[in-house]
A protein has these predicted regions:
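N-terminal presequence-like segments and the immediate start of the first folded domain
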Residues: 1-115, 122-222
């Protein structure tokens, strides 16, 4: 019941065991279980990132969150229209984050990484806050209620063009879950607030081993 991630220029013919297919074109959409991130590949060539598992995958939807899962892994995604005030966008992201954890808990899984694609990532509001700020604030509200320690998932945040916010995550049934920090770096949640207005909350990496596998995996931020 393993997971294998690889790049290919052709869509797989057999999709029963595919938990995610990510396409690199300059628009955000989810059609026929293929996710487009708003980023295009070098030379605009057809490139697909395929997440293949060793057992069958089912698909469902919860509160506008698309879910693909099997006995070991769960992939979920949400697309949010980038409209409204700072507080409205922050609340929308906060609600999706809360739903991510509700879905994962109901499936007895732990989120190991969350990816974010935000339009106008460093757009400045009147109070000098940015779209990255609102993401950090929304995430902090959820994490303070969910985590009693600093065992946050890994994360990626990328700025894109367009008017849609994309957030997706990977969760797993974890026999072991351990966060990894880089001793040569200040941990994100310890950034000095007199220098950084944002308070990112993520781990540099997460190592985990699923219940049905003997191999430990490491998933990194960035």
């Amino acid at each position: 019941m393993s997971i294998n991630v690889f790049l290919t220029d052709k869509l797989p013919k057999q999709k029963d065991n595919i938990i995610s297919i990510i396409s690199f074109v300059d628009k955000v959409e989810y059609i026929d279980n293929i996710l487009s991130t708003g980023l295009f590949s070098y030379g605009r060539k057809n490139v697909y990132e395929v997440w293949e598992t060793s057992d069958e995958v089912s698909h469902e939807k919860y509160n506008d969150i698309y879910i693909s899962k099997n006995n070991n892994y769960l992939f979920g995604l949400a697309i949010i229209e980038n409209v409204g005030s700072y507080e409205e966008l922050k609340l929308n992201i906060q609600k999706k984050y809360s739903d991510f954890y509700k879905i994962s808990d109901e499936n007895k899984m732990s989120i190991v990484k969350i990816w974010h694609y935000l339009p106008q990532l460093l757009k400045t509001y009147n109070d000098k806050k940015t779209n990255y700020s609102l993401l950090c604030e929304a995430r902090e509200i959820v994490y303070k209620n969910y985590y009693k320690d600093l065992s946050y998932p890994a994360a990626t945040v990328i700025g894109i063009e367009g008017n849609k916010i994309l957030i997706y995550f990977l969760a797993a049934i974890c026999k072991n879950y351990k966060v990894i920090e880089n001793i040569r770096q200040v941990s994100s949640y310890n950034y000095p607030q007199n220098i950084f207005s944002e308070k990112p909350m993520f781990s540099r990496a997460v190592s985990f081993k699923t219940t049905y596998e003997n191999v430990e995996k490491i998933i990194i931020s960035g």
